[in-house]
C-alpha cells in the first residue's frame, strides 16, 4: 500500500506543474519528440528535458531513444491508477453528501430564534 501511495504522490507532484500537464496532454494524442513537446512551451531544451525526467520518474511517460531522437509516449496505466484514486474519493464523498441530503430532508427545520434589537 505504501508503494502505491508513494507512486501516487509522484504522479500528482508531477502533474502539479502546468508545463508538465501541457506535455501530458500533448502525449495523450500520441508519441512526440522532446523538441516537439518543448515548442509550445517556449522553454530551453534542458528545461524541457528536466520536466520530462520528472514525468518519467513518476511513471506517467516513457522515453525511447532511436539515433539522436528521443521519443516520449504516455503510460496509460499510470493515468488510470490516478484516475481510479480520484474516482474512489469522489464516490466516497458523493455517498456522504447523499446521506446528508437524506438526513436533512427528513429532519424538521428548527424554529428560528428571534433576537431583540438593541
Cite the ranges covered by each PLM segment:
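Pre-recognition alpha-helix immediately N-terminal to the DNA-recognition helix
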Residues: 21-23
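Short, Lys/Arg-rich nucleic-acid/phosphate-binding segment
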Residues: 65-71
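Short helix-coil-helix linker/hinge
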Residues: 14-19
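Conserved N-terminal beta-strand and adjoining loop/helix that marks the start
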Residues: 9-13
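C-terminal regulatory/oligomerization modules of transcriptional regulators
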Residues: 1-7, 26-45, 54-62, 77-118
